[in-house]
C-alpha cells in the first residue's frame, strides 16, 4: 500500500497586498543598541565596578589639582602657613622636602591610598595635624546641621503642598497655580537668607545666637537658612506630581467607596514619594557638603567649610579625605533612597501594575508669567539705559529716589543700572547651562545603571571644588563658571528622570503596548519620553535661578567675571557688608532673583505632557484610510460595482496602516 500523505498544517490566510515594510532606520537601530546596552549594564557587579572607577577618577583629579592649577603647590602651602613669610627659594625648597612634592602627584597619591588602607589619612600640609580626626569631627557637625535643615525642609514642603493635598482629597481639581511664593523662596540665595537671619534675629533682636556651634540653640538659624529654600523646591516638585496621583483610577475608586479624604491624601503622598526620593538623597548630600556659605557666615566648623579651606590652600590630604567622605555619604544616601523607593512601590514594579501619573492637565494661568515677564523686562530695560560703572563718592549708599530707583552702592554706582546690565550675561549663561543640563539629565536618565553612580559621585563634589577642577583643566575665563556649573547641574535632573522612568516602565499600558508588538523606538518616542520630559523640564526651570546664582558665585574665586563686572552674584557679595546700613543695595538684586524664580515656575506650568496627541494622529490616520479613494470606472461598468472593491480595499488599508499597538 501506498503510505498516506503527511498531514499538513492549515493553510494560512492570504495576506493583503500591503507595501513592503521599510528597512530599519538609523534611529531604530540606535534605539535597539541602547536597549541592549541598558540590559547589559543591569549586572550588579558592573555597577559596583563603575562606581569604584568614578570614585577613583575623582580622587585622582583632586590629587592632580595643584599641578592642574599651573601654580607651585609649595608657594600656595607656604602662603597658607604664614602670609608674612617671604617666598624665597630656600623656603620653597624646605616645603617641597617636607611634603615630598618632588616625587610627583602619582607617587603622592599612591602613598595616600596606601596609608588609607591602614586607616591613616595622612597629615595636613598646613597644620601638620592628623587628617582623619578633623574630617570625622567636621562630618559629624555637618550631619547634625543637615538633619536640622531636612526637618525644616520637610515642614516647608508640607506647607507648600497643603493646598494641592486639600483640593485633591476632596476631588476639586482646578487649573494648576504657579506657586510664585514658593518659587521666590526657592530662588533666594542661602547666604543672603543666612545674613538676614543673623543680622535681624541674632544681632538686632538677640533672640538666638548668630555665631558659633555650642548647642542646639546655635543650630536654629543655620537650619532655617538651609532648609527654607530646599523645602520650597522639594514642595514644588511634590505639588507638581500630586494632581497626577489624584487622577489615577485607585483614587476614583477610593472616593466612590467612601474613604475619607485624609486616607486618600496619605496614599497619594505614598504614590508620589518614590519619584522624589532620589532627589531627597541628593538634598542630603548637598546640604552636608555644599553649605559652605552658611557655615562661613555662622562660623560653623563643618565639612563644607573645611573642604573649602583645604581647596583654597591646596591642602591635598584634607581635601581628599573630605571628598572621599562625601562620596561615601552620597553612595549610602543614594542606595537608601532607591531601596526605600522600591520598598514603597512593592511588587508593582515587577508586575507592571502601575498607572501613569503624568497625564494631560488643564492649561495653567497665562496671566502670571506674562506679568512676571513684563516686570523683569521693565527692570532690565530701565537699567540698560543707565551707566553701570559711573562713580559718585558723594552719593554713596543713598536710599531709593527718582534719580536712583534702587539706590546706590558703596561706591555711588546706580544699583538699577548694574542689575540691568548684569542680566544680559547672567540670564543668557543661566539659560544655556540649564538647557545643557536638561538634555544631559534626560539622556543619562534613560540609562539609570550608568547614571546612578555618576549622579552620586558628581553630587558629592562641592561647587567650589568643581570650579577649581574645571579651571585647572580648561583654564580661568569668562565661560569657566558655565562649564563648572554645567558639570554638576545635570545630576538632580538625571536622578529625577531615572526615578520617573523606572515607574513608567512598570505601568500597565506600557506592558500592553509591548505585548502588542511595539518596538523599542516606538516605546521610547511615544510612551517614555512624553511621560518623563515634561516633569523634568519643569524641574529644570525651577533650578534656573539657582543656576544663575551659582554662575555668579564662582566669580568670587577668580574663575569668571571680576569686579567691576555687574554680575548679580557680585552685586550681592559687594553690598552684603552694608546690608544693615543700606538694605536696599542687597534687596534689589535679591528681589530680581526672586522675580526670575516666579517667572520660571509660572512658565513651567505651561510645560505639560500631551499623551493624547499620538492617539489623535492614529484616529486621523484611520479616518483617512476609510475614505473611498477615487477610482476610474471602466466604460460600460456600473458605478455601484466599482464601489465594493474600493470599500474592501479601504478596510484592508486601515487594518494594515494602524500602528502595532492597535493590532
List each model region and its residues:
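Generic hydrophobic transmembrane alpha-helix motif, especially the helices
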Residues: 176-232, 405, 454-495, 499-503
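An internal, D/E-rich "acidic patch" concept
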Residues: 101-154, 158, 409-410
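Transmembrane-helix boundary motif in ABC transporter permease subunits
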Residues: 125-129, 145-183, 195, 199, ...
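Membrane-cytosol interface at the C-terminal ends of specific transmembrane alpha-helices
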Residues: 215-255, 476-526, 539-544
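Transmembrane alpha-helix signature in integral membrane proteins
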Residues: 48-56, 132-163, 224, 269, ...
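Hydrophobic alpha-helical transmembrane segments of polytopic membrane proteins
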Residues: 149-155, 222-233, 304-340, 568-604
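Transmembrane alpha-helices
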Residues: 52-61, 262-294, 427-436, 521-553, ...
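C-terminal transmembrane helix and the adjacent membrane-cytosol boundary/short C-terminal tail
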Residues: 320-361, 485-488, 499, 542, ...
Amino acid at each position: 500500500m501506498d503510505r498516506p500523505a503527511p498531514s499538513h498544517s492549515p493553510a494560512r490566510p492570504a495576506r493583503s497586498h500591503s507595501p513592503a515594510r521599510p528597512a530599519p532606520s538609523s534611529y531604530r537601530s540606535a534605539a535597539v543598541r541602547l536597549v541592549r546596552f541598558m540590559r547589559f549594564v543591569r549586572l550588579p557587579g558592573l555597577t559596583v565596578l563603575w562606581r569604584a572607577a568614578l570614585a577613583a577618577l575623582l580622587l585622582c583629579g583632586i590629587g592632580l589639582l595643584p599641578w592642574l592649577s599651573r601654580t607651585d603647590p609649595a608657594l600656595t602651602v607656604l602662603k597658607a602657613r604664614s602670609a608674612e613669610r617671604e617666598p624665597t627659594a630656600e623656603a620653597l625648597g624646605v616645603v617641597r622636602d617636607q611634603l615630598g612634592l618632588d616625587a610627583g602627584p602619582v607617587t603622592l597619591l599612591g602613598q595616600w591610598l596606601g596609608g588609607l588602607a591602614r586607616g591613616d589619612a595622612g597629615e595636613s600640609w598646613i597644620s601638620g595635624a592628623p587628617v582623619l580626626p578633623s574630617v570625622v569631627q567636621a562630618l559629624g557637625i555637618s550631619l547634625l546641621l543637615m538633619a536640622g535643615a531636612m526637618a525644616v525642609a520637610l515642614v516647608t514642603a508640607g506647607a507648600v503642598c497643603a493646598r494641592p493635598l486639600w483640593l485633591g482629597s476632596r476631588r476639586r481639581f482646578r487649573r494648576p497655580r504657579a506657586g510664585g511664593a514658593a518659587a521666590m523662596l526657592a530662588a533666594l540665595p542661602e547666604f543672603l537668607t543666612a545674613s538676614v537671619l543673623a543680622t535681624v534675629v541674632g544681632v538686632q533682636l538677640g533672640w538666638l545666637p548668630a555665631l558659633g556651634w555650642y548647642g542646639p540653640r546655635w543650630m536654629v538659624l543655620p537650619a532655617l537658612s538651609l532648609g527654607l529654600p530646599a523645602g520650597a523646591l522639594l514642595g514644588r516638585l511634590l505639588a507638581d506630581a500630586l494632581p497626577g496621583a489624584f487622577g489615577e483610577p485607585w483614587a476614583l475608586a477610593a472616593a466612590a467607596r467612601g474613604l475619607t479624604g485624609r486616607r486618600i491624601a496619605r496614599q497619594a503622598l505614598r504614590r508620589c514619594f518614590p519619584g522624589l526620593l532620589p532627589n531627597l538623597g541628593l538634598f542630603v548630600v548637598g546640604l552636608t557638603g555644599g553649605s559652605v556659605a552658611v557655615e562661613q557666615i555662622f562660623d560653623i566648623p563643618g565639612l563644607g567649610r573645611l573642604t573649602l579651606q583645604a581647596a583654597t590652600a591646596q591642602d591635598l590630604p584634607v581635601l581628599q579625605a573630605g571628598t572621599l567622605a562625601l562620596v561615601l555619604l552620597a553612595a549610602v544616601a543614594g542606595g537608601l533612597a532607591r531601596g526605600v523607593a522600591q520598598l514603597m512601590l512593592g511588587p508593582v514594579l515587577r508586575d507592571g501594575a502601575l498607572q501613569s501619573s503624568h497625564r494631560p492637565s488643564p492649561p495653567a494661568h497665562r496671566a502670571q508669567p506674562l506679568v512676571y515677564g513684563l516686570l523683569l523686562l521693565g527692570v532690565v530695560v530701565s537699567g540698560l539705559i543707565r551707566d553701570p560703572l559711573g562713580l559718585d563718592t558723594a552719593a554713596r549708599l543713598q536710599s531709593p529716589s527718582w534719580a536712583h530707583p534702587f539706590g546706590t552702592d558703596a561706591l555711588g554706582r546706580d544699583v538699577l543700572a548694574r542689575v540691568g546690565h548684569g542680566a544680559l550675561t547672567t540670564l543668557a549663561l543661566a539659560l544655556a547651562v540649564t538647557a545643557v543640563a536638561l538634555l544631559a539629565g534626560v539622556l543619562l536618565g534613560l540609562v539609570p545603571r550608568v547614571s546612578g553612580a555618576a549622579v552620586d559621585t558628581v553630587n558629592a563634589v562641592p561647587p567650589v571644588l568643581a570650579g577649581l577642577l574645571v579651571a585647572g583643566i580648561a583654564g580661568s575665563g569668562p565661560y569657566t563658571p558655565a562649564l563648572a556649573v554645567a558639570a554638576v547641574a545635570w545630576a538632580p535632573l538625571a536622578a529625577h528622570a531615572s526615578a520617573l522612568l523606572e515607574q513608567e516602565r512598570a505601568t500597565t499600558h506600557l506592558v500592553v503596548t509591548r505585548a502588542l508588538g511595539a518596538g523599542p523606538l516606538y516605546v521610547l518616542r511615544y510612551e517614555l519620553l512624553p511621560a518623563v520630559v515634561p516633569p523634568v523640564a519643569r524641574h529644570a526651570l525651577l533650578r534656573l535661578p539657582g543656576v544663575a546664582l551659582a554662575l555668579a558665585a564662582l566669580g568670587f574665586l577668580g574663575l569668571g567675571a571680576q569686579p567691576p563686572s555687574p554680575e548679580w552674584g557680585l552685586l550681592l557679595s559687594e553690598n552684603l557688608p552694608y546690608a544693615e546700613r543700606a538694605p536696599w543695595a542687597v534687596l534689589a538684586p535679591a528681589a530680581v532673583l526672586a522675580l526670575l524664580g516666579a517667572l520660571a515656575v509660572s512658565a513651567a506650568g505651561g510645560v505639560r505632557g500631551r499623551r493624547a496627541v499620538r492617539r489623535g494622529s492614529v484616529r486621523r490616520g484611520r479616518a483617512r484610510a476609510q475614505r473611498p479613494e477615487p477610482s476610474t470606472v471602466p466604460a460600460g461598468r456600473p458605478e455601484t460595482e466599482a464601489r465594493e472593491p474600493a470599500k474592501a480595499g479601504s478596510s484592508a488599508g486601515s487594518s494594515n496602516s494602524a500602528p502595532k499597538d492597535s493590532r
